[in-house]
Amino acid sequence: PDSVRLRDYSPINVEAGRKLIAERGLQDTVTFDEVNAYDRTNYQDLQPRPTLGIVSGLHELFADNDLILNSLYGFGDAIETGGYLIYTGQPWHPQLEMIARALTSHKAGSPNWVMRRRSQREMDQLVEKAGFEKIRQWIDEYGIFTVSLAVKK
């Protein structure tokens, strides 16, 4: 690729990612920035414009579909027509309670969080609302994890 842009809200993750980029000598191609993925303005005026966006594990963190749409609209604003969005889903999980107690970093350490499950249909509708058309989906043998590919209309 000509360029790769990585983004995360956690300064710890960004610092670790930048270290790996430097260790591998990829600074001329790869950048890693600390941003809020749910703020649509963080997707504006990206240069070069992305032709591919990947969002993984982000949309399960919060129940509010408006936050999810802000993220997806941002991808829709940024990605060129004919470009692609790869997104993940978790329609269900047998260990929701354990995950909720173990993964608390995004909720200021609060144990009072449970992953927001969205049906595949709901997730696909949100992606479509943001200007993409789903063209392919893969799912694991247990029906827990999905990966979908959509094209920008």
Locate predicted features:
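A short glycine-rich, Lys/Arg-flanked "PGG" loop and its adjoining helix->strand segment in the class I
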Residues: 68-81
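Conserved beta-strand signature within the Rossmann-like core of class I S-adenosyl-L-methionine
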Residues: 81-90
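Conserved Class I S-adenosyl-L-methionine
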Residues: 98-125
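Class I SAM-dependent methyltransferase SAM/SAH-binding core
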Residues: 1-39
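A short acidic, Gly/Pro-enriched loop at the edge of an enzyme's catalytic core
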Residues: 38, 42-53
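Helix-to-beta-strand junctions that scaffold the AdoMet/dcAdoMet cofactor pocket
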Residues: 26, 62-63, 79-81
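A short SAM/SAH-binding and catalytic strip from SAM-dependent methyltransferases
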Residues: 50-66
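Core SAM-dependent methyltransferase catalytic element
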Residues: 130-153
